[in-house]
UniProtKB/Swiss-Prot annotation:
It comes from the Bacteria. Keywords: Plasmid. Gene3D superfamilies: 2.30.30.100. This is Uncharacterized protein pXO2-37/BXB0038/GBAA_pXO2_0038. It comes from Bacillus anthracis.
Length: 259
């Protein structure tokens, strides 16, 4: 038997027992149901290991027990019992902080639509870089992986219109449309086609690094950039042309010359 001792330089992402310091709401020892992308059946078992990119389940089968190692990138959602959020477990927890990386906030009702077209409606309890913690309308608790989502439907919010290298404070003050990383801009109408075969049309309200905010005829939705098949829209100048024109405009606004 080999006994390994943790040295002074042991990675800070592991505790004194060598366990990965994960940021999920569910804990080791919890009984869960894991729904995978492109799989009909659920994986049911007890979590024994949580690492950065995978977790391990103890599963009781008809012919005996076994383990499965689940790739987080292939997970749609993990159903589990109610747990405090990661923020609530922190000594620095602030109850008043309800901001997310989206326009909607913690505590709001949202509709999560997966890449296969199916969805879960519920109340947002917390957000992490990789997941949303949601209490469904049927009082079930889910960790929903962002990478499995096409879009999120929510109530109407004002766009953030945050400035960046291509949308400066001068442009915002001068009431110029916000450019996006695509050829279209904020205010343009587009139709978004998803791998599931579904599509939605609406006006672009805002854009961030990971999402596009769209106002459809009936609702407001946040579309994940990694989920769409293609955008259909009017004909615009090439991105190279728009890049050069945008750079000229920024220089003019900063110099005060708008002629």
């Amino acid at each position: 038997m080999v006994v390994l001792k943790l040295g002074k330089n042991y990675p800070i992402d592991r505790d004194s027992r060598g366990r990965y310091r994960h940021s999920y709401v569910f804990m080791r020892g919890a009984n869960v149901e894991v729904k995978l992308l492109n799989h009909e059946e659920l994986l049911k078992g007890k979590i024994t290991t949580i690492e950065e990119y995978y977790c391990v389940l103890d599963v009781e089968g008809t012919s005996g027990s076994y383990q499965v190692t689940v790739n987080f990138s292939e997970v749609k959602y993990i159903k589990h019992e109610e747990f405090p959020t990661v923020e609530e477990r922190s000594p620095k927890y602030s109850k008043g902080d309800k901001k997310t990386s989206f326009v909607f906030k913690i505590g709001e009702k949202i509709g999560c639509v997966f890449k296969d077209g199916k969805g879960i409606k519920g109340t947002l309890l917390s957000e992490d870089a990789y997941y949303l913690y949601v209490k469904s309308e049927k009082e079930n608790y889910y960790t929903i992986m962002k990478g499995a989502l096409s879009y999120i439907a929510h109530v109407k919010h004002e766009p953030l219109l945050l400035t960046n290298d291509f949308y400066t404070e001068e442009m915002k003050l001068a009431d110029y449309k916000k450019p996006t990383e695509y050829v279209f801009s904020v205010g343009d109408t587009i139709t978004v086609y998803f791998p599931s075969g579904k599509n939605v049309s609406g006006v672009v309200l805002d854009e961030s690094k990971y999402w596009v905010l769209l106002q459809t005829e009936k609702r407001q939705i946040t579309i994940f950039k990694g989920s769409y098949s293609y955008f259909k829209h009017e004909t615009y100048e090439t991105k190279a042309y728009l890049y050069v024109e945008n750079r000229k405009l920024r220089k003019q606004l900063r110099s005060g010359d708008t002629n």
